[in-house]
Structure formats: structure tokens, C-alpha cells
Design a protein with these regions (language model features):
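A general structural signal for well-ordered alpha-helical segments in protein cores
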Residues: 18-19, 112-117, 143
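Predominantly a Rossmann-like dinucleotide-binding segment in NAD(P)-dependent oxidoreductases
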Residues: 1-36
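C-terminal helix-rich "cap/oligomerization" subdomain common to oxidoreductases
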Residues: 53, 118-149
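Conserved glycosyltransferase catalytic-site signature
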Residues: 15, 19, 42-46, 133, ...
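NAD(P)-dinucleotide binding in Rossmann-like oxidoreductases
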Residues: 37-43, 53-117
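Short beta-strand scaffold segments in enzyme catalytic cores
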Residues: 48-50
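Residue-level signal for the nucleotide or nucleotide-sugar donor/cofactor binding architecture
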Residues: 13, 72, 131-134
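Active-site rim elements
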Residues: 7-9, 103-106, 125-129
Length: 149
């Protein structure tokens, strides 16, 4: 939601998931964070800068002012001399990854079914939760602080 009073706005309600994804991919704690908003009344167009305890950096461009023809969700990972580019959770291209160049899915898969199954298994079978509580609290705290900057 864009309404800051109902739902906390898009940083708390939506961009938080991208912060969470970067925490998962890096596997380390966020050391520093900053946000730069575009000058709009809705505060729904922003760039978020994250740095992690291992020196990794992450940048989230959460924009509401682009063309609908551009992929809505795009993730680029630069590591070990290679690049992975994920578009809309359907198309993955690899550059500089020996033996891998691309993968395409028929439909978008953001992992919700797998996450629900992991959550149910954690409760019913005593497995570890799919997302550690410390990560949930860290991402929530940082998302709230970023939304208030």
C-alpha cells in the first residue's frame, strides 16, 4: 500500500521483502543502510543502499515511475567474476558461470509454496523455521527505520 497510515507504506509493506532476499543471499548481517527517496508525496520511489558485515553491498531500486513494459522485479548478482540476472522470477541468465547460461520457467515462482511448506514442516515436524527469527527482526527493524528517513 502507498498509504503510510494503513500498512506503513511501500517500504514496510513491499520493499522489505527485497531486503529480506538480500539478507538470505548474502547470509550475513546488515552493517549499514541508507535510503534516498524521490521527491514525491507517496514516498514510493526510492533507492536503498545496504552494506553487510562481510563487505558485500546491495542496492534496491524500488521505483513506481517506470514503464510497465520493463520487468517489474529484477535481481542482478555479481560474484566471483560472474553475473546472474533474474527477471520476474521466470527468466535467469548467467554470464561467466561455466556450464550455465540460462533458465526459463513457464510461470513465475517466488517460492511462496515452498516457504509455506517449510513453515508447516517447522511446526509439525520440529524443523528449523524457513526464515530465522533474527533475520525477521533485523529486516523489520531496518525497514521501519528506512521508511522514516
Amino acid at each position: 500500500t502507498q498509504d503510510l497510515e494503513v500498512g506503513g507504506g511501500r517500504i514496510i509493506g513491499e520493499a522489505c521483502h527485497f531486503i529480506d532476499l538480500l539478507v538470505f543471499l548474502v547470509g550475513k548481517t546488515i552493517k549499514k543502510y541508507q535510503i534516498q527517496f524521490m521527491d514525491t508525496s507517496t514516498k514510493d520511489t526510492a533507492t536503498i543502499f545496504l552494506s553487510f558485515e562481510d563487505g558485500s553491498i546491495g542496492t534496491i531500486h524500488y521505483y513506481a515511475n517506470g514503464s510497465k513494459s520493463f520487468p517489474k522485479e529484477r535481481l542482478e548478482v555479481f560474484a566471483g567474476g560472474g553475473v546472474l540476472c533474474l527477471e520476474n522470477y521466470r527468466k535467469l541468465n548467467g554470464y561467466g558461470w561455466p556450464g550455465f547460461t540460462k533458465m526459463n520457467l513457464w510461470q513465475q515462482d517466488k517460492g511462496q509454496k515452498a516457504c509455506v511448506k517449510a513453515f508447516i514442516d517447522a511446526i509439525s515436524k520440529g524443523n528449523d523455521p524457513p526464515i530465522p527469527a533474527k533475520d525477521i527482526f533485523e529486516v523489520s527493524r531496518i525497514s521501519i527505520k528506512l521508511s522514516k528517513q
